[in-house]
Amino acid sequence: MKTLLLLIPLVLTACGTLTGIPAHGGGKRFAVEQELVAASSRAAVKEMDLSALKGRKAALYVSVMGDQGSGNISGGRYSIDALIRGGYHNNPESATQYSYPAYDTTATTKADALSSVTTSTSLLNAPAAALTRNSGRKGERSAGLSVNGTGDYRNETLLANPRDVSFLTNLIQTVFYLRGIEVVPPEYADTDVFVTVDVFGTVRSRTELHLYNAETLKAQTKLEYFAVDRDSRKLLIAPETAAYESQYQEQYALWMGPYSVGKTVKASDRLMVDFSDITPYGDTTAQNRPDFKQNNGKKPDVGNEVIRRRKGG
């Protein structure tokens, strides 16, 4: 019974379902990747606080970080690979008998009263027949076990999907409309809204702990936005960040499964560097100097460097 329980995991190792979850931009998207990219971008756009723009006509400017590149992910999943060879090899004795044809030659010589007869026997140099006999037993025994993964995974990432920017821009416009904010051409706007999308892509990872294995695909959307009154140059919305990530994960045991499939959407880490602590220089004479007396009551935090300069340190 113990032997049977040990053999079952070895036989079933690497038996499972392979789901296509490539890197961002690798040809036609799988449904899983589409779902994750859409979920993270929708969540990030939905988090945008646009209350300060109520009743305004906004011109929208969206800038997205480029994601063109090329890469290659190759190599199958890790799995046990064992081989047992053995053990017994025997060749029987072999004997071959050849049969060569023979022929007789007789020569008679006469000279007057003398005569002689010569008789000789000759063999051909090629056998007319051959007979081989084997004696004894011949046997060969071997045993082998080889367990491989579910296959080689290869992904090509070359070109970005040109529709991504259009999709994200349409999502932002949809949220503006649902919030009651009118998006108009720049010549009819009283407010300029700038949205910078720093992160908009996917990250694929694989966890291999021999007994526990996992395939994970994450989609992240991180953006920063601010709004300016076109006439007064007041900063209606200080630079704010919205960041979300969605995740799809398959969990395996000895690459059997997946026994668990999960999807999550959550807030992710903010931008490593944002512009929320930037304020105008005190001696600026620019006509379009932004006014940080904001209508939404959200005054940006002043950085340590700015405080040091104000104190003359």
Curated annotation (Swiss-Prot):
Region spans: Disordered: 282-313
Bias-annotated ranges (Polar residues): 282-297
GO biological process, one term: cell adhesion
Membership in a protein family: Belongs to the MafA family.
Organism domain of life: Bacteria
Gene coding for it: mafA2
Membrane topology: Lipid-anchor
Subcellular location: Cell outer membrane
GO CC terms, sorted: cell outer membrane
Keywords: Cell adhesion, Cell outer membrane, Lipoprotein, Membrane, Palmitate, Signal, Virulence
Signal peptide: 1-14
PROSITE patterns: PROKAR_LIPOPROTEIN
Lineage: Bacteria, Pseudomonadati, Pseudomonadota, Betaproteobacteria, Neisseriales
Lipid moiety-binding region (S-diacylglycerol cysteine): 15
Protein name according to UniProt: Adhesin MafA 2
